[in-house]
């Protein structure tokens, strides 16, 4: 019996739409980049987990939506986050998700996913600079609060 040893080719690509010349130097900068990624009326509707990708100079390469959840939670896969970071040649990332309730306090699950991503990213020499919890009126920064 003959075996067909043909395999499919995997193509990976990243097509930047713009070149940001601005550095993300603090959590407020990250918030200002991330807030406009929410369509009007959606930040209070349900949870979305997003990642902001940065180069060596901490300039924004882009962002991606990792997951879309319900009113009280969303599930983020560490592998999907790191896959996107590797595809964009990111040196650093900023995790972000919103709390539709407006409560800025991180949950136990928020703390756990932050730890998991940070530990996995370290193996790839990618730095998790922050994890922001966003609302329409403000944000919570894991980095600013010493939780990273």
Residue ranges with predicted function:
Residues 1-16, 32, 55, 72-148:
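Active-site-proximal loop/helix of nucleotide/amide-processing enzymes and allied scaffolds
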Residues 18-80, 84:
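Glycine-rich, small/polar surface segments that engage phosphate groups of diverse ligands
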């Amino acid at each position: 019996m003959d075996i067909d040893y043909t395999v499919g080719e995997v193509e990976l690509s990243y097509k930047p739409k713009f070149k940001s010349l601005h550095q993300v130097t603090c959590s407020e900068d990250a918030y200002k980049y991330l807030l406009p990624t929410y369509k009007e009326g959606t930040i209070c509707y349900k949870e979305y987990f997003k990642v902001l990708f940065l180069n060596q100079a901490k300039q924004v390469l882009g962002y991606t939506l990792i997951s879309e959840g319900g009113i009280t939670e969303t599930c983020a896969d560490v592998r999907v986050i790191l896959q996107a970071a590797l595809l964009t040649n990111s040196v650093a990332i900023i995790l972000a998700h919103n709390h539709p309730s407006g409560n800025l306090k991180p949950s136990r699950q928020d703390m756990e996913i932050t730890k998991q991503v940070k530990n996995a990213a370290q193996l790839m020499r990618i730095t998790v600079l922050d994890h922001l919890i966003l609302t329409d009126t403000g944000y919570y920064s894991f980095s600013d609060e010493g939780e990273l």
